[in-house]
């Protein structure tokens, strides 16, 4: 039982780790509160996804005029893999004749019967039942730009906490993935790919967790696992996708959109994973980083989401500093970290930790966030919720960083937390910490 629980909850954290993988953070969203079950709700209207934040309309995202658009592929993945939109529009006429479309529809509908139920249960827990905690705890004046290190596949958690965000960035070892195959999959391959996807998203739509095995496997699926996971977040939160492009960073950290010629050139080269013991991707380097534009139905302005496939340990950030330059240019931002394998506790992740301490205006995390060992000397205040007796992962328990968190909870006032949002502690208790400048 203990081994199974550990496998379910271990997240991957964007660097090199030994006891856990180094990719994305597990979302660890407990849709059962702390052990309580919910009935499947009626799908929420778009407004039901709005929790905390300013009532002012979001600032318009700058238009994109360059780069190859994968809008059509994004729309297909949104409908087929993430199960957004009407069932009658799931398989468009462009995917084949009536007989083929009927077969594809049956495959997609079987998948969506499972996924829509899980999305609805999640929505009931976090956008409805636990809505009040986020609305009351998160200030309305925080920046609308959100950076989520170690957050691969977990746009959903950022949408729960910060529904007014106009720009969200996640970073992890997982590469975004190639969306092109969704247009040509036959019913058998589509069924196999969707079945694999339901396994590979792990507990994203239940306990919000994943394992390194699943995250590695995503990179070999015909359906891009990272993109599909993010689109599930949009569907669950009541958003629609408007465009999707891929990009790279230049030496100064500026976004450069991938053109068709770049894709054709990259397709000739073999791609390696960002972690040595992971399966090699079945797609090219051109599909490492993705930008998805989205909005609520009827909303005039697009919002921007970007996922970076990037190793966040010090060695790699020294070799490839473009990401830090890109992030620093955003100025003060709102931050989120959870399920991050305690990598921010380690001395080998000092560069990303220092960036966070220098640029956070307000941060929400579980105990895998920035420990008081580093936050207090940087002039931060940390407010705790729930209870904490030590790290969930045994290999991170009892370290100086972990003990500083135990001491923080011991000296802080007791604040209740009626749900799980990230890792539990060594005793199975949910907990959260707010970090902000004094």
Question: What residue ranges belong to the model's regions?
Answer:
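Short helix-loop boundary/capping segments
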Residues: 206-283, 289
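Sec-dependent signal peptide recognition
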Residues: 1-7
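Non-globular targeting/processing and membrane-anchoring segments
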Residues: 29-202, 284, 296-438
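General secretory precursor processing signal
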Residues: 7, 15-16, 86, 115
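Acidic, Pro/Ser/Gly/Ala-rich intrinsically disordered segments
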Residues: 16, 22-24, 47, 54
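Intrinsically disordered, low-complexity, compositionally biased regions/tails
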Residues: 8, 17-19, 27, 37-39, ...
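Soluble extramembrane regions of membrane proteins in the secretory/endomembrane system
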Residues: 288-294
